[in-house]
């Protein structure tokens, strides 16, 4: 598994300063891209309107990005921070672990699009590593 360096952590925190307070907008767009591009992801929300601009999409986007904001706030103890979320996704929601990397890709796209001046090669690499670590921890309870 990737290990986040001090520089990675600083890069992630610097970018996340621009995400904080806008979790629903960033999350809505990232989830919207995933739901549009990957039809089977709709199965987790059979009774929800997942169209662009829907309340359900904004609400869940805010939850996802809020969880990532919490992870950034506790970046030095990600395993303990994400244990409940991991349990929930593995045992209650039973989300296919293959969906996590897909969402991570869409989050990278959204951050890069909205924060181009901040999204240098090094920052992109740090965010990618952070998302990889968080996603691996979120699927760790699937065993």
Curated annotation (Swiss-Prot):
Pfam families in alphabetical order: Globin (PF00042)
Binding site for heme b: 89
Tissue note: Red blood cells.
One GO term describing the cellular component: haptoglobin-hemoglobin complex
Limits of the Globin domain: 3-143
Source species, domain of life: Eukaryota
Gene Ontology BP, a term: hydrogen peroxide catabolic process
Sequence positions that bind O2: 60
Keyword terms: Heme, Iron, Metal-binding, Oxygen transport, Transport
GTP-binding in keyword set: no
GO molecular-function terms, A-Z: haptoglobin binding; heme binding; metal ion binding; organic acid binding; oxygen binding; oxygen carrier activity; peroxidase activity
Record family assignment: Belongs to the globin family.
Function: Involved in oxygen transport from the lung to the various peripheral tissues.
Summary of subunit composition and partner proteins: Heterotetramer of two alpha chains and two beta chains.
Protein name (Swiss-Prot/TrEMBL): Hemoglobin subunit alpha
Origin species: Ambystoma mexicanum (Axolotl)
Lineage, broadest ranks: Eukaryota, Metazoa, Chordata, Craniata, Vertebrata
């Amino acid at each position: 598994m990737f290990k986040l360096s001090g520089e990675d952590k600083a890069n992630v925190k610097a970018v996340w300063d621009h995400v904080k307070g806008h979790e629903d907008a960033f999350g809505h767009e990232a989830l919207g891209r995933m739901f549009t591009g990957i039809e089977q992801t709709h199965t987790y929300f059979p009774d929800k309107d997942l169209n662009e601009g829907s309340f359900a999409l904004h609400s869940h986007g805010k939850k996802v990005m809020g969880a990532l904001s919490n992870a950034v706030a506790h970046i030095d103890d990600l395993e303990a921070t994400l244990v409940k979320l991991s349990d929930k996704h593995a045992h209650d929601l039973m989300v296919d672990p293959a969906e996590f990397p897909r969402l991570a890709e869409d989050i990278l796209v959204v951050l890069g699009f909205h924060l181009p001046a901040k999204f240098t090669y090094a920052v992109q690499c740090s965010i990618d590593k952070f998302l990889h670590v968080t996603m691996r921890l979120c699927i760790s309870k699937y065993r």
